[in-house]
């Protein structure tokens, strides 16, 4: 006797709920930095409406309710409103805001929408919304290969990722500053000096080029500024790391904290690496 198949709740490649086209209002949003282009599929309405809005969540909700009213005038009782937009710099706030108001909101993985060769050549806002609409409709039907969704994190889950991401940015910034300082030394012919030393800034004025000259004044001032920036960045990195340790000590058994400590202990990685793995790789709500 074969075991019945169970639903994989973390399968974002297709929708697991049945789709009733006569009772479902479908909309996709093409987002830009200045406006939202909203395309809809409204039951009972032959035209497929397309509306450009200012970036205003209340105007979007009013538009959806207006389309719902149009469908109900045609005898279709709308029991489900499904909205989707591509993941991007706008984040997930709109999906959470819509969900709190009874709208089923999905965020499409930006690289997952199937694009035909013709659409690659001709790119317009209308084509973009058509592609999103086609991909979202296929996904709602439960068909694979149209697009994939990303899990919508809570505000707390998003915020929990900030320290690791900020630390990564700061580490990169510190590395770039040191590279710039070393490049300046190379241009002057100065070698064997470690700009990462704590006393590096105070020793700059004692350095001499192979020609026996001190570092020129403008270059010296720039080097001092870069080393001061590097000192500040390193201090910020230490603050993030200390805050992370304090949080783990306060609630070591809470949620992902236990997994962070387990990874750090079992596979021997640092706390920051373990936290990154838990938040960005192992979490089902990763973006």
Feature map (PLM): residue ranges:
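A detector of single, family-specific signature residues
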Residues: 1-287
